């Protein structure tokens, strides 16, 4: 995240870490904010004519939701009037270049949703809240596709289990 702080990409990346999809981020405006509450009710999508338009719902009607975002992020959206105004594909291109420059394993912008689900789970947030914030309607999808383990958290869990298994 430090690499995008202060850039035009910061808001979009941070919202990605809140579990938002790229199209949802690109459709967000300050009108979607009520203090720290961000309503996710639309998405920027490409049409069959290869034009980008705002669709009046996110990926699914079950994806409509309101999430709480931090003060600084809310203030940025309020000040700028939007979350990301440029072409949605630029988020993917920027991330690809950033990952390559940093020499870290490649990942997609959409993978930030998995980061959100995994981090929230590792913090002990119940699945019902993770699902509500990420716009998932099925624990099956959440568990099968999005939740992953973090090596440090897994190591902590293994040490805890090991301590209980000692004679």
Question: Regions from the language model: what does each represent?
Answer:
Residues 1-26, 113:
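Basic, Lys/Arg- and aromatic-enriched nucleic-acid-binding interface segment
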Residues 2, 27-76:
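Conserved tyrosine-mediated DNA breakage-rejoining catalytic core shared by Y-recombinases
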Residues 43, 65-105, 116:
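Active-site/catalytic core of tyrosine-dependent DNA strand-transfer enzymes
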Residues 32-39, 126-145:
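Short, polar N-cap/turn motifs at the start of nucleic acid-interacting alpha helices
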Residues 24-26, 107-108, 117, 124-136:
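Active-site-proximal segment of tyrosine recombinases
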Residues 44, 134-159:
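Catalytic-site neighborhood detector that most strongly recognizes the C-terminal catalytic loop/helix
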Residues 158-166:
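Short, basic, alpha-helical segments at the C-terminal edge of helix-turn-helix-like DNA-binding modules
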Residues 9, 63, 103, 111:
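Exposed loop/turn and edge beta-strand positions of beta-sandwich/beta-sheet ligand-binding modules
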